[in-house]
A protein has these predicted regions:
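C-terminal cap of metal-dependent C-N hydrolases
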Residues: 30, 34, 41-44, 368-411
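Histidine-rich, glycine-flanked metal-binding segment
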Residues: 36-78
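N-terminal signal peptide c-region/cleavage motif recognized by signal peptidases
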Residues: 12, 17-19
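Bacterial N-terminal signal peptides that target proteins for export
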Residues: 1-10
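Glycine-enriched alpha-helix->loop->beta-strand junction motifs that scaffold or abut catalytic
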Residues: 252-259, 276-283, 311-313
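Polyanionic/metal-chelating signatures
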Residues: 122-125, 130-259, 387, 422-427
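His/Asp/Glu-enriched, well-ordered alpha-helical/loop segment
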Residues: 93-95, 100-104, 111-112, 234, ...
Length: 427
């Protein structure tokens, strides 16, 4: 089943006569997966006007006169893919510290650190991600020695300087082994620090009038944690072990005002029923099927399948190389299908479900009033050999070039023995 998208659509239908005066694109002859109760529409025409979906219907009759027409040639059309956990745009070269803004190990601050302040929309990883069909990315900071990693963002992959959609989308907190090591050496220490931090944030600024330090946070971090501590901002909790996830569920029941989602969740299937009852979403990587640590001994390729079957709100991410390979979220979804996840559920897990988790209104579906993030494919989007032919972000047809494709085109046609461009043989 595809989870219902909680969004408010614009009332009324747009008249075809009014389409011509706006920027209009019509994608015809498409197998369109809508992400709604409408399901997959064969021989569909998708009409986009001024950055929004205006109509989805069968057949090509009555197209707007001034529409740019793209023939999908029977191929798939889907909503733009959302990568729900990555560090795209925060790192250019992993081995060069000056280009790495994922963490700040020497900083006095933790929650106050905003990934948006280091995000580069023109990083070479952004077009690499976009040309694979990913139109929106959730970008998280990395812990720099504190269980509170900082605050993440949501951006589109257009590469424009205005591509950040939400520069303060969530707070990332690491529990389990990582939280224990960063909070004093044990899980109880991590939970004690979290409770103290919530108290500091909820009593800000009163308890800081005479002092700069609270029980767990500085004045600056306590102020930054305030919205999340009051349930006004999402808290992403990184946890893998079943007992750690169970503790998060119990903590959420104790603090009903908090908005919590799990990221990681390698053993989440063991507590799937509890997660479903608590309505706590989980972001998992279907690739994670081996016990990389003692908190992942129960990792299995059927984690995603078991979570979805239990009714857990489940999204997929690729976490193996989160700085450069957010695009592989599609391969993760394909692996989930290979291990029993329904094809519709897998597509939902990388479109409508992450939009729901991160509160992205009118995103992740193809229906009237939705944002026109749309991808045209040359095959099944979850097949590893398929690729996009067109990527639209807010109704704009995007460049399908990246640094890698330019290098390919530059050198692929060299004659045998020919020197690369910018190199000349000596006379």
């Amino acid at each position: 089943m595809i989870p219902a998208k909680l969004s408010t659509l614009a009332a009324g239908a747009l008249m075809l006569a009014g389409f011509a005066s706006a920027q209009t694109v019509a994608i015809t002859n498409a197998k369109t997966w809508t992400g709604t109760a409408q399901g997959t529409v064969e021989n569909a025409t998708v009409i986009m006007v001024d950055g929004e979906i205006a109509e989805v219907r069968t057949g090509e009759n009555g197209l707007p006169a001034d529409a740019e027409v793209i023939d999908a040639e029977g191929g798939w059309v889907t909503p733009g893919i959302i990568s729900p956990f990555s560090r795209t745009g925060l790192v250019e070269v992993n081995a060069e510290d000056s280009t790495n803004d994922t963490y700040a190990g020497a900083s006095d601050y933790s929650i106050a650190l905003k990934a948006a302040d280091g995000f580069n929309p023109m990083a070479t990883t952004v077009p690499v991600t976009r040309i694979e069909g990913v139109t929106r990315i959730v970008v998280a900071p990395r812990s720099g020695g504190d269980m509170f990693a900082g605050r993440g963002l949501v951006a589109n992959t257009s590469g424009g300087q205005d591509s950040i959609i939400d520069d303060d989308a969530f707070v990332l907190i690491r529990m389990g082994e990582a939280g224990a090591s960063n909070a004093g050496g044990s899980r109880p220490a991590a939970w004690a620090r979290l409770r103290a931090a919530l108290s500091d944030a909820r009593t800000f600024p009163a308890r800081f009038l005479a002092h700069n330090e609270g029980d767990a946070l500085t004045r600056v971090d306590a102020q930054a944690f305030g919205p999340a501590a009051r349930g006004q901002q999402l808290i992403l909790v990184e946890a893998h072990r079943a007992s750690d996830i169970k503790r998060v569920i119990e903590f959420a029941r104790e603090s009903t005002e908090l908005n919590i989602a799990i990221v990681g969740g390698d053993e989440a299937w063991m507590v799937a029923e509890d997660l479903a009852n608590a309505k706590i979403p989980v972001i998992v990587d279907p690739f994670q099927n081996l016990p990389a640590s003692f908190e992942q001994l129960g990792a299995t390729a059927e984690n995603a399948k078991r979570l979805i079957e239990a009714g857990v709100i489940t999204s997929f991410a690729h976490m193996g190389n989160d700085t450069h390979q957010a695009r592989l979220v599609l391969q993760s979804a394909g692996n989930a299908v290979a291990n029993g996840v329904d094809h519709d559920d897998a597509l939902a897990a990388i479109t409508v479900v992450p939009a729901l988790i991160f509160g992205l209104e009118n995103v992740g579906t193809i229906e009237p009033g939705a944002v026109a993030d749309v991808v045209v494919w040359d095959g099944d989007p979850l097949e590893v050999m398929s690729a996009p032919t067109h990527v639209f972000i807010n109704g704009q047809d995007q460049s399908m070039e990246s640094r890698q494709t330019r290098l390919r085109d530059r050198y692929l046609g060299l004659e045998a023995g020919g020197a690369p461009f910018a190199y000349k043989r000596s006379e």
